[in-house]
């Protein structure tokens, strides 16, 4: 089965052809990230306008790269929520029109389930049950995937998502958007123990909170500026990264230990962070 997938929940317009849910035949991404970077983050109105501008050509290229037409596609899938409402509407309406015109089934996909399912593309032998940490700009969830379409949320952020905290800390430190890669790059030359940042306490064993941690960094930087003292960007980036990644890894591994999960995976943009992957991998070996 060949499925045309369409994604437009944030600042990237994407389309892909996937075979049997495991093999990517083509994958095309059109992004407005450079334009968004001028504002230090995603501007919803700009994102929506760029989706409307890019989506037709993006889908056409995905089909062309796969050497297919809509006649070869068995279904159209589209992310329907959550996301920036204007951005989501562009993708959903385009997908609805395309599916109707081609006489193909339309499959709505939840954003978080899409993040989780991306692991099926890179881990061909992966199958439920498994535990997944979804960490992105809008979400920080620990999810038990009990079956192919059955999920149980064990924990989540009670305020800021991990990726959002990364972006705001990056902006405070004068690092470019997107914040995740920028903080990680700066952290390579820093001391992760240079700044003593707080460990947030939150109700719910697997829940997380990053608002206080983000605020602690902002206050540290502002206090130093008011006193005319320098802030070591590399050290602060490393200290923040170490704290937030330690929290995420600890919560995930604690859930894995308590549930007896035999497989643990990561999803979302923050999952690209090398330190987080190292912490989870090292900890998983001890379970």
Where are the regions a protein language model picked out?
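N-terminal beta-alpha supersecondary unit
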Residues: 2-82, 111, 115, 234-236
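Short beta-strand scaffold segments in enzyme catalytic cores
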Residues: 13-18, 132, 140-144
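Nucleotide and nucleotide-moiety/phosphate-recognizing core
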Residues: 66-72, 94-111, 118, 283
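Glycine-rich beta-strand-to-loop/alpha-helix junction loops that act as flexible
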Residues: 78-81, 98, 136, 264-273
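Glycine-centered tight-turn and secondary-structure capping sites
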Residues: 87-95
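Conserved phosphate-binding catalytic cores of ATP/NTP-utilizing and phosphoryl-transfer enzymes
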Residues: 109-131
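Glycine-rich phosphate-binding loop plus the immediately following alpha-helix
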Residues: 124, 147-191, 214-215, 219-223
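A contiguous, well-structured pocket-lining segment that forms one wall/lid of small-molecule binding clefts
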Residues: 185-264, 274-287
């Amino acid at each position: 089965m060949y499925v045309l997938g369409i994604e437009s929940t944030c600042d990237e317009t994407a389309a892909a052809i996937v075979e049997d849910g495991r093999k990517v035949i083509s994958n095309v991404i059109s992004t407005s990230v450079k334009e968004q970077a001028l504002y230090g983050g995603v501007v919803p109105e700009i994102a929506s306008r760029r989706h409307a501008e890019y989506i037709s050509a993006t889908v056409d290229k995905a089909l062309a790269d796969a050497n297919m037409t809509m006649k070869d596609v068995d279904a159209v899938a589209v992310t329907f929520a959550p996301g920036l409402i204007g951005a989501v509407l562009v993708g959903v309406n385009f997908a609805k029109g395309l599916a109707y015109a081609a006489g193909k089934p339309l499959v709505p996909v939840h954003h978080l389930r899409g993040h989780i399912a991306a692991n099926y593309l890179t881990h061909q032998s992966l199958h439920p049950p498994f535990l997944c940490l979804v960490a992105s700009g809008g979400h920080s969830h620990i999810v038990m995937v009990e079956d192919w379409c059955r999920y149980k949320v064990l924990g989540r952020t009670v305020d800021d998502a991990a990726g959002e905290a990364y972006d705001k800390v990056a902006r405070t430190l004068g690092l470019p958007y997107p914040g995740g890669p920028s903080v990680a790059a700066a952290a390579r030359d820093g001391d992760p123990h240079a700044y003593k940042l707080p460990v947030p306490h939150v109700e719910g064993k697997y829940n997380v909170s990053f608002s206080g941690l983000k605020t602690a960094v902002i206050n540290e930087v502002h206090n130093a500026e008011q006193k005319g003292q320098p802030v070591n960007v590399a050290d602060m980036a490393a200290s923040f990264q170490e704290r937030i990644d330690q929290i995420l890894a600890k919560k995930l591994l604690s859930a894995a230990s308590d549930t007896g999960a035999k497989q643990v995976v990561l999803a979302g943009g923050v999952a690209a962070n090398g330190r987080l992957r190292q912490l989870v991998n090292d900890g998983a070996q001890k379970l």
